[in-house]
Every structure is written in structure tokens, then in C-alpha cells.
């Protein structure tokens, strides 16, 4: 899979995520709930203020961490002034 990305709504991005993005791009550590797997991803702010997970999102898809039709819950949390993300998959 090439160039996969996860995009968050403008209103959600502006309220909860964008303040953590330095410049238009920053790094984000993403972990999967219930596993020890973590993935380094790029967090990007688009021109219309949407936050997007880009580089690294493919790793999560390729690891088959979830299937089509699964519901993913994205739990953003601030730890020592750094944004981290834990993904919960509901099958």
C-alpha cells in the first residue's frame, strides 16, 4: 500500500491536535492498545487545518492491526507536553 494516510476532521484537529504540531509537520508515537507495538508516524497539518497521520500509517495497515469494518478509537493524550496516540480497535 502506498501513501496511506489517516485524516481527522477540521474542527477536531483545531481543538485537540494542531497545537501540538510544530510547523506543518511533526513526529508522533502511535501505539496499539493491547499490544507492545509502537509506530513512529508523521503528523501533518494540511492547508485547511486538518491533522493527518502520514508517514508510518502504512506500517499499521501492513501489520494488519485492523480489518475493513473494524471501528478504531483514537485516544490522544499529552505526556510531558508531548502528544501521543493510542489506537484501540473494536472488532
UniProtKB/Swiss-Prot annotation:
It holds the Pfam family B3. It is found in: Nucleus. This is B3 domain-containing protein Os03g0164300. Keywords: DNA-binding, Nucleus, Transcription, Transcription regulation. GO terms for molecular function: DNA binding. The keyword DNA-binding applies. GO terms for cellular component: nucleus. InterPro entries: B3_DNA-bd, DNA-bd_pseudobarrel_sf. Signal peptide: none annotated. Residues 1-91 bind DNA.
Amino acid at each position: 500500500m502506498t501513501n496511506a494516510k489517516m485524516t481527522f476532521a477540521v474542527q477536531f484537529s483545531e481543538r485537540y491536535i494542531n497545537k501540538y504540531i510544530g510547523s506543518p509537520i511533526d513526529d508522533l508515537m502511535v501505539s496499539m492498545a493491547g499490544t507492545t507495538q509502537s509506530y513512529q508516524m508523521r503528523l501533518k497539518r494540511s492547508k485547511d487545518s486538518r491533522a493527518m497521520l502520514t508517514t508510518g500509517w502504512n506500517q499499521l495497515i501492513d501489520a494488519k492491526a485492523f480489518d475493513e469494518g473494524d471501528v478504531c478509537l483514537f485516544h490522544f493524550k499529552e505526556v510531558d507536553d508531548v502528544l501521543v496516540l493510542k489506537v484501540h480497535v473494536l472488532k
